[in-house]
């Protein structure tokens, strides 16, 4: 490959989306939950997806990862169409997923979790322990004895050791104390700064704004809002009405 071609490809990777969704219709069996949804995320960006409970946010992630039914549309990672791929194939292609229920195994230690799905790359167990120092002291602890915050850190760490190019996180701050939430948000920002594209479902709008380069809102499976964090702040009342969730003040130390 010539130097010019290699350079051109690097430039394209910077400017082209890392992940794209085109006119997705998806749901469970014959039931359609997501309708005509499209968006794109570039490398090193975070997209926050907001909306009230039951509007299809989790179903969206389940469809992207192959756990729910895709009726039509396209799921593209880099230059590859992953729409027909299996859940395993999508993970191998670089799609990481932290589900809402965390899926931590009670009978495995922290260290054993970080061997699951491990692939060569920047993110290994040592890098995860550096990102989450609290886990380093719990290497031999079973999943059953971890706190909710520790389980969430471990779920993120387990996804990271697969060295995905795109990470999906479904409400990672749910049910956690403000102190733990602040630490998680700082960790997610570091992940984004390392060049990963992150898709974040978040019920708390202040958290969504604190992390996002871009925000979208969905209602009844359809896109009802799209804008950056500054626009979302400026249109606070309008977006609150759309998503049915109150927008609280964003802490200054968590904003860009």
Regions found by a protein language model. Name each.
Residues 69, 81-102, 125, 137-141, ...:
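ABC ATPase NBD coupling module
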Residues 167-171:
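Catalytic Walker B motif of ABC-type/P-loop ATPase nucleotide-binding domains
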Residues 50-52:
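The feature captures the beta-strand-to-loop junction immediately N-terminal to the Walker
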Residues 65:
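Helix-to-loop junction immediately C-terminal to a conserved catalytic motif
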Residues 159-160:
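ABC ATPase C-loop
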Residues 142-146, 150:
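Conserved ABC ATPase signature
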Residues 73-81, 93, 121-123, 127-130, ...:
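Conserved ABC transporter NBD signature motif
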């Amino acid at each position: 490959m010539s130097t010019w071609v290699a350079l051109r490809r690097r430039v394209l990777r910077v400017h082209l989306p890392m992940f794209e969704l085109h006119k997705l219709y998806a749901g469970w069996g014959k039931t359609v939950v997501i309708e005509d949804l499209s968006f794109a995320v570039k490398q090193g960006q975070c997209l926050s997806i907001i909306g009230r409970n039951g509007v299809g946010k989790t179903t969206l992630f389940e469809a992207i990862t192959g756990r729910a039914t895709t009726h039509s549309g396209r799921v593209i990672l880099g230059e590859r169409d992953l729409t027909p791929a299996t859940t395993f194939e999508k993970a191998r292609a670089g799609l990481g997923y932290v589900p809402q229920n965390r899926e931590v195994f009670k009978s495995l230690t922290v260290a054993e979790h970080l061997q699951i799905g491990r692939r060569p790359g920047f993110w290994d167990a040592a890098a995860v322990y550096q990102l989450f120092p609290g886990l380093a002291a719990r290497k031999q602890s079973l999943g059953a004895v971890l706190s909710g915050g520790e389980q969430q850190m471990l779920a993120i760490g387990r996804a990271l050791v697969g060295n995905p190019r795109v990470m999906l996180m479904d409400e990672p701050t749910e049910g956690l104390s403000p102190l733990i939430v602040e630490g998680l948000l700082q960790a997610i920002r570091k992940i984004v700064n390392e060049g990963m594209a992150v898709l974040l479902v978040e019920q708390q709008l202040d958290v969504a704004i604190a992390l996002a380069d871009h925000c979208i809102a969905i209602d009844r499976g359809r896109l009802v809002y799209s804008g950056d964090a500054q626009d979302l702040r400026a249109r606070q009342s309008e977006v609150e009405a759309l998503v049915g969730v109150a927008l609280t003040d964003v802490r200054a130390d968590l904003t860009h």
